[in-house]
């Protein structure tokens, strides 16, 4: 019953996923979050699931996202945080960018540029990144909210199949 309830919930919050869309499965299917939102839900709506053929590393994941161009990205916080630390933080720490981030109008220009680069890093065609399976770094989450990045954080546990709460 809990699995069916999670599928019904996912159908409401991810209405754009259908037989014409794709996801990259990078989480282990032994993990309820990965099983539920990278396999069972996709099967229920007929979406294409692309499995990684090797153990996921940042490079393998980024290559898969670029190749598949998924409609939804399902990830654990560690994946998102590694992308943030490797692609975003070095740019934001440059002296000129730090200065621009202090200026009211120009900071939004910088944020929009960073957002575009991040969207492209995730394949460029997704409409949402769903983060769950562990606590999300508050600095990264606050920055993603500030720039208007399309992400959602889910909270849960295996015994609940797995979603308990969903912060949209």
Task: Please place each PLM-identified region on the residue numbering.
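Conserved G/P- and acidic residue-centered "switch" motifs that form tight phosphate/ATP-binding loops
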Residues: 46, 133, 156
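Conserved AMP-binding/adenylation subdomain of ANL enzymes
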Residues: 4-22, 29-117, 146, 150
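Conserved AMP-binding/adenylate-forming core of the ANL superfamily
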Residues: 1
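Extended hydrophobic secondary-structure segments that form protein cores and membrane-embedded regions
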Residues: 22-26, 128-130
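Alpha-helix-centered segments that form part of catalytic cores
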Residues: 103-141
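Active-site loops of AMP-binding adenylate-forming
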Residues: 136, 145-149, 157-168
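Short, acidic/turn-prone active-site loops that include or flank metal/cofactor-
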Residues: 54-56, 156-159
